[in-house]
């Protein structure tokens, strides 16, 4: 009784409700005092726990008491309170013993949505606990999504092998392939041809083309269709002094982005009199133009190798180099067991060729073809190039980036040691002022992508390096390690870096890069979480007002990185203002960011803004080139692709996609030295992030199945009572359909159960003869459900 009175009377600091409850000793009649009392008690337990931790006192009695409150919360639809209480006491793994069939979905949903707001290692603990619960209740597709988020290969393998249901395994293989994880399958799975197709991503081109057929967009588009020159003001038409080779190169890029993955166009894959577009460009332009074949035929390896083959015998070295890069682009994101890319690109004639472009193209091609694969054989090929100090910095740096992409997020110690040793080497230190050094740093940073505190080892090593490049490298490494986590403390650290005023001295260049990377880091870390994104966008406004030129240059890029393929009015209107900035570098980066924001969306407002910019900058070659690139990005895949690294209902961050985006943005910090200079082929790193934004439904034999789905704006239903609708403002469409950013689909047809928890990408449907209900969905993975269906038939 005193405990209950303590709730209404007395000093809150004294925690009397808890004090008298602990003196009672009995925990039987807790619920009889009502919900308000239990919540008050939970609040005081949290406060007392902190007090005792600070005073280093025993806390076992508090833990026992809180565990007796959990069943009450769960039985009264207060799952959030139960999770919060156990989280406060750092014993979240205890929740598994209190759950049942009815309570676990809501508890897991709340736990998973909390992860973005937690710090390391608590976020990992939450994901592992939720994973364990899903496995216990046979929700394997939900479990494997969490295993993918944890980047734990052993967990992923265990989930995949936890069932003998072939269709379910194939669905999980689709989820693994979407994250570009290369798993070694078991012997019996290897014999299942269909399963291997799912795991290696080789079925994507087929379904992508069937989507194109459905939407009636198989006809290739020409750059002129995108530029719509007749809509640009005629004021500059007669006055342009654009170098035609440069203009043709821009058209080659636009053509490759717009027709990406469709395997047909009117410029490169043509026979007869017109001849391919390559001959209309010159020097380095030939390299990028030939490489665009890989983008056009993306993932369609058998056909692609055939088409690219003739270019490998060309007499011009630039065209040969382009063909090698095209092979890398073609194989990006698919896995072929015969390893054609490795055989062709690691051939000594190409890797040790006399001219630099061929070597660079081979190295970059290997990085793109095997991104995320952790393939050990590539260490023997690329590590010597990183370690050889006599080589040109460009080659070693590109090899470092390729290794960073191949072993992204694996913290592979062989690669990190090799790059760190190279950075410390006395011979190399003389060359570290080279513009390519930033890619050496990036290669090291990518190894620790998403590894959080594991990066501290490398940061300590970098403190020992006495060179201006050491600081930018450590900033890059730490932002990659915390990418997508939304960690507030890291964001504050980066804002402090941007606050520093750089003094004029020898180290100025390094310090300028530190600030530029810090700005990119702000959006890379805040990416995964919406509140953080809004806060950072506001900070970018301040940085543009008060920052030095090196910071102002990076802000538009960071704005593009925070919302790729998600054109928000507030973002692209701001970028549109920056695109007329007095500082030409800022304007160029803002234009590229506009392309990034609208990539693959064909947003009409953005298209109009870019057309206006094309006529405004008709005399400025560099800026006009960038406007064309942005127009190409906007029409990527004829409006069917996305560059956003988040997938599976925006839960999972694809490391490979984010790494590719970051590589392009790092080169854009000094656009005039790289992309606007001779190294425009660096734009092709975007291919790692390109993926069709479709929903294709398949039957259990993996044949396309047309069903009706509702597509609408996703609604957050965490912690809401009952079974609220998870989409709003929906329209009914028949599959295959396109999903814009922030949209979600629900099945309308009750005859089928989706085997995946989220309707996105490739989804297998299982037919049931009794009407669908949420309980049935839960048992979809259960083999007993299939016998029930057969019996009903």
Regions found by a protein language model. Name each.
Residues 1-317, 330-354, 372-793:
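Long internal repeat-built scaffold domains in very large eukaryotic proteins
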């Amino acid at each position: 009784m005193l405990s209950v009175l303590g709730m209404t009377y007395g000093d809150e600091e004294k925690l009397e409700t808890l004090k008298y409850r602990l003196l009672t000793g009995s925990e039987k009649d807790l619920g009889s005092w009502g919900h308000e009392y239990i919540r008050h008690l939970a609040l005081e337990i949290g406060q007392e726990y902190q007090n005792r931790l600070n005073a280093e006192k025993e806390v076992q009695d508090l833990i026992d008491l809180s565990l007796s409150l959990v069943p009450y919360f769960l039985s009264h639809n207060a799952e959030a309170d139960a999770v919060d209480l156990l989280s406060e006491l750092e014993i979240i793994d205890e929740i598994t013993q209190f759950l049942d069939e009815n309570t676990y979905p809501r508890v897991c949903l709340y736990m998973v949505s909390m992860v973005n707001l937690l710090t390391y290692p608590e976020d990992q603990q939450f994901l592992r606990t939720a994973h364990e619960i899903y496995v216990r209740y046979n929700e394997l597709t939900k479990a494997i999504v969490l295993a993918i988020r944890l980047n734990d290969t052993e967990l992923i393998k265990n989930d995949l092998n936890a069932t003998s249901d072939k269709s379910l395994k194939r669905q999980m293989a689709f989820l693994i392939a979407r994250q570009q994880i290369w798993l070694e399958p078991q012997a019996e799975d290897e014999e299942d041809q269909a399963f291997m197709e799912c795991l290696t991503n080789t079925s994507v081109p087929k379904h992508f083309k069937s989507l194109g057929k459905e939407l009636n967009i198989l006809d290739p588009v020409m750059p002129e269709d995108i530029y719509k020159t007749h809509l640009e003001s005629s004021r500059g038409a007669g006055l342009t002094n654009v170098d035609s080779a440069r203009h043709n190169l821009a058209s080659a890029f636009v053509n490759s982005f717009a027709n990406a993955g469709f395997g047909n166009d009117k410029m490169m894959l043509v026979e007869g009199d017109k001849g391919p577009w390559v001959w209309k460009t010159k020097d380095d332009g030939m390299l990028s133009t030939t490489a665009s074949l890989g983008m056009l035929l993306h993932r369609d390896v058998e056909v692609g190798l055939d088409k690219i083959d003739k270019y490998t015998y060309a007499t011009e070295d630039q065209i040969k180099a382009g063909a090698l890069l095209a092979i890398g682009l073609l194989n990006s994101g698919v896995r072929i067991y015969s390893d054609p890319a490795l055989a062709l690109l690691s051939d000594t004639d190409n890797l040790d060729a006399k001219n630099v472009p061929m070597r660079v193209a081979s190295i970059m091609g290997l990085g793109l073809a095997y991104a995320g694969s952790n393939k050990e054989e590539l260490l023997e090929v690329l590590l010597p190039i990183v370690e050889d100090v006599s080589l040109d910095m460009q080659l070693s740096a590109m090899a470092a980036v390729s290794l960073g992409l191949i072993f992204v997020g694996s913290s592979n110690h062989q690669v990190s040691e090799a790059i760190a040793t190279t950075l410390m080497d006395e011979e190399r230190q003389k060359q570290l002022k080279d513009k390519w050094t930033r890619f050496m740093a990036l290669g090291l940073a990518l190894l620790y992508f998403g590894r959080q505190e594991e990066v501290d080892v490398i940061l300590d090593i970098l403190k020992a390096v006495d060179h201006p490049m050491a600081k930018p490298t450590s900033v890059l490494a730490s932002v990659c390690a915390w990418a997508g986590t939304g960690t507030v403390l890291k964001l504050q650290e980066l804002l402090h870096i941007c606050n520093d005023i750089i003094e004029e001295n020898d180290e100025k260049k390094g310090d300028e890069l530190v600030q530029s990377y810090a700005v990119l880091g702000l959006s890379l870390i805040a990416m995964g979480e919406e509140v953080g994104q809004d806060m950072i966008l506001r900070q970018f406004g301040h940085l543009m007002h008060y920052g030095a030129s090196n910071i102002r240059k990076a802000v538009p890029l960071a704005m593009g990185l925070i919302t790729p393929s998600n054109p928000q009015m507030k973002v692209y209107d701001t970028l549109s203002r920056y695109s007329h900035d007095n500082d030409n570098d800022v304007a160029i980066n803002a234009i590229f960011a506009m392309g990034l924001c609208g990539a693959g969306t064909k947003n009409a407002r953005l298209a109009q803004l870019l057309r206006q910019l094309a006529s405004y900058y008709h005399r400025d070659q560099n800026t006009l080139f960038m406007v064309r690139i942005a127009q190409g990005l906007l029409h990527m895949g004829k409006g069917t692709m996305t560059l956003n690294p988040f997938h599976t209902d925006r839960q999972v961050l694809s490391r490979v996609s984010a790494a590719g985006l970051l590589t392009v943005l790092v080169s854009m910090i000094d656009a005039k030295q790289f992309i606007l200079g001779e190294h425009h082929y660096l734009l092709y790193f975007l291919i790692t992030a390109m993926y069709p934004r479709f929903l294709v439904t398949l039957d259990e034999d993996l044949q396309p199945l047309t069903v009706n789905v509702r597509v609408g704006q996703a609604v957050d239903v965490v912690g809401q009572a009952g079974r609220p609708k998870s989409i709003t403002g929906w329209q009914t469409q028949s599959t295959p359909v396109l999903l814009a950013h922030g949209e979600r689909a629900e099945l309308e047809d009750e005859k089928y159960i989706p085997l995946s928890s989220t309707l996105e990408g490739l989804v297998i449907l299982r037919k049931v003869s009794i009407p669908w209900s949420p309980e049935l969905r839960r048992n979809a993975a259960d083999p007993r459900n299939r016998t029930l269906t057969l019996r009903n038939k």
